[in-house]
């Protein structure tokens, strides 16, 4: 627990679907399937992974031309790869779109998610296969959480910081060490740390609203365990409901911050 960070340094399917990244047991069969899977990234894939967008939940009728028509509104496209079945040639329902400029991919990531194309609401995120060590695709049970309707603890599917665990104390030296460590994370980690700091403040408010700590030591009973489990369940439900309510309001501000920090990060890399 002391090594908890809001940003995943490598992909762990057990923690990927968790709200706070502290789960110790798989909560559904998809997570278990991902834990047992072994995925080797395609080394034949070309292009800049930091300028590549992942688009899924596409209609079988959606073509490369349709994708170009829709996504070219955000900027100049360098390459589109609609993944097809090797035997039948039919679309597998997902594609990769590489842009020429950083501001184009940031704009598409911000505005194109949940866009309706050919009567299907699509899912859009940055490519993670070449950017996150140990990545397991959703078709093998991986990814970052499914739909809310599927009962996932951490739904939405997009790469984002974990919520701070309610039983994790915060000390100044830990905060400083975490901040220094985040600077060494993969591309786009800085902007996600801003979200973590905001969520830290949310955690403080939740704690003020009712988390009580024992005044003195006493034996830990079965009733205590059941009460703690029920309390944790209520807190998770409350945070999940609050996250739903605030998501739309925070998205715009979050993406603007992401775009500024990501552009600065890429500029620093080019100057090295």
Swiss-Prot record:
Give the GO biological process terms: mRNA splicing, via spliceosome
Give the UniProt keywords, A-Z. Answer: Coiled coil, Nucleus, RNA-binding
On the tree of life, the source organism's domain of life is: Eukaryota
InterPro entries linked = Nucleotide-bd_a/b_plait_sf (IPR012677), RBD_domain_sf (IPR035979), RRM_dom (IPR000504), snRNP35_RRM (IPR034146), U1_U11-U12_snRNP_70-35kDa (IPR051183)
Q: Which GO MF term does the entry hold, naming one?
A: snRNA binding
Q: Which residues form a coiled coil?
A: 221-258
What PROSITE patterns does the entry give? RRM
User: Where does the record place Basic and acidic residues bias?
Assistant: 146-162, 190-272
Task: Please provide one cellular component term from the Gene Ontology annotations of this protein.
Answer: U12-type spliceosomal complex
**Keyword field contains Phosphoprotein:** no
Limits of the RRM domain: 51-129
Which stretches of sequence are listed as region Disordered? Answer: 146-272
Q: What is its main location?
A: nucleus
Q: PANTHER family under this entry?
A: U1 SMALL NUCLEAR RIBONUCLEOPROTEIN 70 KD, U11_U12 SMALL NUCLEAR RIBONUCLEOPROTEIN 35 KDA PROTEIN
Protein name as catalogued:
U11/U12 small nuclear ribonucleoprotein 35 kDa protein
Q: What is the species listed in this Swiss-Prot or TrEMBL entry?
A: Xenopus laevis (African clawed frog)
């Amino acid at each position: 627990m002391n090594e908890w960070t809001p940003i995943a340094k490598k992909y762990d399917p057990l923690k990927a679907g968790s709200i706070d990244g502290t789960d110790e047991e798989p909560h559904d069969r998809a997570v278990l399937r991902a834990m047992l899977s072994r995925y080797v990234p395609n080394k034949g894939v070309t292009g800049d992974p930091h300028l590549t967008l992942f688009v899924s939940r596409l209609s079988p009728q959606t073509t490369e031309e349709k994708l170009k028509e829709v996504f070219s509104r955000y900027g100049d496209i360098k390459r589109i790869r609609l993944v097809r079945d090797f035997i039948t040639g039919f679309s597998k329902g997902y594609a990769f779109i590489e842009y020429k400029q950083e501001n184009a991919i940031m704009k598409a990531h911000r505005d194109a998610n949940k866009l309706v194309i050919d009567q299907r609401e699509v899912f859009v995120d940055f490519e993670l296969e070449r950017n996150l060590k140990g990545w397991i695709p959703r078709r093998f049970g991986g990814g970052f959480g499914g739909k809310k309707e599927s009962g996932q603890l951490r739904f939405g599917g997009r790469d984002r910081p974990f919520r701070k665990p309610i039983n994790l104390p915060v000390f100044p030296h830990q905060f400083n060490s975490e901040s220094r460590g985040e600077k060494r994370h993969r591309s786009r980690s800085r902007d996600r740390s801003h979200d973590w700091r905001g969520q830290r403040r949310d955690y403080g408010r939740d704690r003020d609203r009712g988390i009580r700590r024992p005044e003195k030591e006493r034996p830990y009973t079965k009733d205590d365990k059941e009460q703690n489990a029920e309390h944790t369940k209520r807190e998770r439900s409350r945070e999940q409901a609050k996250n739903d309510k605030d998501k739309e309001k925070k998205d715009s501000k979050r993406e603007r911050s992401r775009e500024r920090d990501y552009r600065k990060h890429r500029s620093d890399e080019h100057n090295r």
